[in-house]
Amino acid sequence: VDRVFLVCGGQKHLMVRVESKNDFDYYAYVMRLDDQKVSYYFEVQTGRITGIFDMRGLVQEVNEYYDFIIIPGFHTPDWAKGAVMYQIYTDRFCNGDSSNDVLTNEYCYIGEPVHRVEDWGRYPAQMDVREFYGGDLQGVLDKMDYLQDLGVEVIYFNPLFVSPSNHKYDIQDYDYIDPHIGKIVSDEGDLLPDGQRENRFASRYIDRVTNKANLEASNELFAQVVAEAHRRGMRVILDGVFNHCGSFNKWMDRERIYENAEGYDKGAYVSADSPYRNYFDFHNQAAWPYNNSYDGWWGHDTLPKLNYEGSQELMDYVLHVAKKWVSPPYNVDGWRLDVAADLGHSQEFNHHFWQEFRKAVKEANPEAIILAEHYGNTRDWLQGNEWDTVMNYDAFMEPVTWFLTGMEKHSDDYREDLLGNAESFWGAMRHHTSSFSMPSWQVAMNELSNHDHSRFLTRTNHKVGRTNTLGPQAAEQGINKAVFREGIVIQMTWTGAPTIYYGDEAGVCGFTDPDNRRTYPWGHEDQVLLAFHKDIIRLRRENEELRIGSLKMLENDYNFISYGRFNRKGQCAILINNNNHPITKEIHVWEIGTPKTGKMKVILQSRDDGYCMEGAEYEIRAGKVLIEMPQTSATILKYVEE
């Protein structure tokens, strides 16, 4: 290389060579930043050849979409960079306190009585939202040793606030943890009699969810959960549902639960004089009392859309909620934001809200993370003044799923043209990762499965369908655990925060929701998969380059990808053979900073018949390693100094 330029704002700045090591020259340029975002790329000149280096790598043409980005003043929490997260759907994780279980006929939800499931191992019903298995926060406390032993660094809870469903994305009261997963100290009243569908007569439920003794005891228990997690070095993220609430919500009160409860104002459904009337958009101003003409999210009357533009008081209150839970005595470490791009009635207001949300949260807890659910281009929200990062569907879950299984993430489609398609894999990764600045990418939530999609292990069977068409047993048939382990290796060696959906590590299967919300199989875990997760998480922790190192694509072929994770302290090469036959590959490891001669050692290899943590050593010759890989295998090689 003759010269290297930093190109920024249309100006070229000559860079200075500051170091040479292992056949690499290192160039630097120091520039003073103001408060404006900086986009840049590098121009590399050698002889008469000029190349452009941007987020795509070395290319011939400039494309500003792939420029590197620096956002002055923007940082994401160091604790979240590369952290191993664990998602808990509380009702299905562990029942530690049967006294708080939802009771059959306690109330009605979507027209039918709720049901307490007595058999922990039963498949979820097709209409699962009103079925309760009894998992709770005491169960999480009881399993803290398990989570710590697994290597979990962050617990992400699906919603925990008062709500009539098991998923709790229809929040009833943002100020309190649901006593059904918290603590019930007052348990007065009766169940609904047979044939009764009106929840204003559900006196047992009303006492459980409106009695301040229950609500405060539940909040206290949650504070204990967070404190215990912190004591063990783990963080906690809450799920925030702020685009909509539930029709049971005390602000709306369509079920008339709060209408006569002590200490509560009338809901907006009940009375035109409700202090919450402007929290919602009502289409018929003459329909009170019991006005059912409110705007629901995507038309769902169980999910009233919150009308922030119509009520500054509502916005102030939700920002108060956002601050409350990341502050003492709860001290939560961040928010995952449900359908965050849908909030408000315009994009302009949406951005305004999240800017104010960020200010509020970071003021209360500067090291709290703000992580949004989003599909599609995230760039507009990741400019340093709104979200920290996103659930990484486009630049992780989807490309990994297509490459390893050929399946769409709901198991709704099979694409043979994408199965094993390394070019498509890297194209998707490059394109979608370009939406991130480095601080956002390092904390992106990288999932293989979650509560909205089929379990990854089920996708390995290539069955297109859902539980209502194929039945739940089909989700377990023809699965390929070796392919699943390939996915785990990618997840645990990719840039970002690998996030395990509870039970994946134990071999739980399931089509898309509700079947993906099966219970954790305590006492019936797949011990090999569980041990594999523990071992690879330990490797990630012991080898810093796997957690926060740079990532570089290496050799690729049909059904084969390889890439490096590296920094000045260590270099690892990750090789994935998704073929059903062995292959031999030559890997140019010098590109990740190894010497031209030396050795690389297998520190993990997964195969059809299991896995091992130690394997052969391979000679580096002229910067390359020649390696034989078994079928359906994943290998991590690490450079070892002699």
Q: What residue ranges belong to the model's regions?
A:
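Short, solvent-exposed turn/loop segments enriched in Gly/Ser/Thr/Pro and often Arg
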Residues: 90-92, 155-167, 238-249, 338-343, ...
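Active-site cleft segment of glycoside hydrolase catalytic domains centered on the general acid/base Glu
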Residues: 304-312, 339-358
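Conserved, mostly hydrophobic/aromatic
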Residues: 88, 147, 157, 174, ...
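Carbohydrate-interacting/catalytic domains
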Residues: 1-89, 95, 101-103, 125, ...
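Conserved alpha/beta catalytic core and glycan-binding cleft of carbohydrate-active enzymes
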Residues: 248-253, 322, 329-331, 354, ...
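Substrate-binding/active-site clefts of carbohydrate-active enzymes
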Residues: 90-153, 160-329, 357, 363, ...
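Short, flexible loop/turn elements at secondary-structure junctions
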Residues: 31-35, 46, 89-94, 161, ...
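Loop/turn elements at helix/coil->beta-strand transitions in domains of secreted/extracellular proteins
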Residues: 82-83, 150-155, 230-237, 330-335, ...
